[in-house]
Curated annotation (Swiss-Prot):
Ranges annotated as spanning the membrane: 28-48, 57-77, 102-122, 142-162, 199-218, 239-259, 275-295
GO-annotated molecular function: G protein-coupled receptor activity; olfactory receptor activity
Family: Belongs to the G-protein coupled receptor 1 family.
Cystine pairings recorded for this chain: C99-C191
Keywords, in A-Z order: Cell membrane, Disulfide bond, G-protein coupled receptor, Glycoprotein, Membrane, Olfaction, Receptor, Sensory transduction, Transducer, Transmembrane, Transmembrane helix
Membrane topology, as annotated: Multi-pass membrane protein
One cellular-component annotation, GO: plasma membrane
PANTHER family: OLFACTORY RECEPTOR 51A2-RELATED, OLFACTORY RECEPTOR 56B1-RELATED
Glycosylated residues in this chain: N5
Species in which this protein is naturally found: Homo sapiens
Protein name as annotated: Olfactory receptor 51A2
Gene this protein is translated from: OR51A2
Amino acid sequence: MSIINTSYVEITTFFLVGMPGLEYAHIWISIPICSMYLIAILGNGTILFIIKTEPSLHGPMYYFLSMLAMSDLGLSLSSLPTVLSIFLFNAPETSSSACFAQEFFIHGFSVLESSVLLIMSFDRFLAIHNPLRYTSILTTVRVAQIGIVFSFKSMLLVLPFPFTLRSLRYCKKNQLSHSYCLHQDVMKLACSDNRIDVIYGFFGALCLMVDFILIAVSYTLILKTVPGIASKKEELKALNTCVSHICAVIIFYLPIINLAVVHRFAGHVSPLINVLMANVLLLVPPLMKPIVYCVKTKQIRVRVVAKLCQWKI
């Protein structure tokens, strides 16, 4: 399929890429990709179902975990249409409007996930540092308020992205470097001044960096507090809970950092590596986090096993 590349016609369609150099194998590559999407959606859906149907899990930590699962579902479903259209149907083109909408949801759910991980770190710090006041501070109403505030904050932060991208002119190139639309990828194709997008994109990245720093501070304080717990059993329980949260933080932020490095040195990195890193960013975290929480959180693991046994009977 020929790709339009002209300086005379304003472009309204973008072309996404699958695996550069492996186009002949896209149908086979779609099998593991579809499997990963399916596992991620089923895994996060299971987490939500277990927490909703089990009254003993109706507590602040599990409500925040539900928010994390919902943001992972949103992230998976946002990228699903273009990824499947490329690998299953060999249809890499997408309209500019669809592209701008997709990057809004991808970035929005990414920022929301970062916010939820920050909330969860504060939740664990409060539970360990001040356990007697924990339930009185984090009431169900307050948890709902926190969730609503951070959801609005996340979406408002990325709301300008589609509008600033739409205000740009695209008249030279129209091929993106990923299987889905990202703000930093689209703005590079503009043939008009994109300084506003560069500055605002940097501001968005800075917000994620602040979240990461605050999360690191929270868990550092937790690790300092844990040795002071009188009961060895409670100390191990607190550490075990924190380990699952720390794993979730690493799973989320590590691909983002790697992709940022790849974008920074894009001229020295093969297009295949670029695409692989981008797919890891959106496929692996939603896939791995339900597994981590099922393995490391006994309350969820026991309920999942019980439900599976119940359905088998």
